[in-house]
Structures are given as structure tokens and as C-alpha cells.
Amino acid sequence: GFVYWHYWFGNGKRLLERPFNEVLASEQPNFPFALAWANETWSGSFHGLKEGNVLIEQTYPGDDDYIAHFNTVLPAFKDHRYITCEEKPVFFVYRPFELPDTKHFIELWRSLAIKNGLSDIYFVAIIGSLHTDDRANEMYNRAKNLGFDGVNVVNAYDAPITDLKYRLIRKVFFKNLKCIPDIRPYRADMFDSCLDGRMDVIPTVMPNWDHTPRTGKRGILLYGSTPVK
């Protein structure tokens, strides 16, 4: 299936919703899909901005907004193409710990789902920055305690940190070249996690990675992945 990023910044503020709306309305392509709520403020270099600059702020106005948000995605949940787990529509949350009341949000949406003829919702927390096994287990347990059914492990932004040899080479030979992005060879173990064997964990497979179109010289680029790796 295909997971579409879904933007809801609070008070009904949305962006980039047209492509998915057309998929929903046209019933094409006839291909399984799910939604992932990219609930974060657009700011800093990760979003192609100077540090400290904010383009769009993510807000959480409260229950009325949560209900409006649910009603907006309900037609997608009821679409026959929508990906389900245990007969529940799967919904990803990009920043699961940034909601001021994550557990309440999940409980509210579960009740709304049942009231609207769904069996429930299968909530998946997207987690990263898992530099150690202890950190990975801490984040996993935190997500589960908030009510998430599953966890998606994404270490894409942490991957270069693990390559000590490459960091040393860059520091010694390229310390004055601040005008080039962070270019490093791909290694499969960059994305391994001690959580990957759990039944409620969705590992991430990433065929290369290039964030430079958005972040330019401050971006990260991984190259050289193959099906074998």
C-alpha cells in the first residue's frame, strides 16, 4: 500500500490535501492506502528554512478541533481501499509525543470511530532517535502506554550518526567545506532496531535517502543501497 502524509495544523488549517482528495473522489488508483498525520511545526532547516524561522505552526486547540479533524478523515477510513489491521483503519502519527493530551486524543477518536460504524482505529506511533536499545525500549513503552496499537521505527535522521569512521574522515578532511551536504554511504544496519522483531512494530526499509532538495547544503544524502543490502 501507499501512505499519504496528511496535514492538519489545528483550527481546520490544512496544506497539500488536494492530491489525496482527488484519489478519494476519483477512486483511482485502485491501490491500498493509509494516512499519516505529519503533526509538526514547519520550521528550521529540516523544512528548508533558516534556523528559528517558522512557516506554519502546529497547534492543538482542543476537542472541537479533534472532532473536526476526525470528520475530515472519516470518508478515507470508510473507503474500501483503506489499509486495515485487525479490521481497523491504520492511522500513523508522526509526532506522537507532541500532542498535549495524546491519550485523550486516541480515546476520543476511538469513540468517534465506533459511533460512525467503524470497529476501532489502529493507531501507529512513528518513533526515531533510537541511538541505544534502552532508548528504543523507552520510546516503545511510552507510545504503548499512551494507547498506540503499533509503532513504526524510523532511524533515517539518526543513521549518519552511527558511522563513526565517516564522521572522522569528514571532520579531518572536510572541516572547512561547510557548503556541501552530508553525503555518506548506505549501510543496512543504520536502520536496524532491537524492536524490529516485535509483532506490533513496523520496521522501515529505505532505498537511499536524499533530503537535499529541501535542505540544500545542510541536508543528508545516503547512497549505494541495493536489494542485497
Show which residues each predicted segment covers.
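Glycan-processing catalytic domains of CAZymes
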Residues: G1-K229
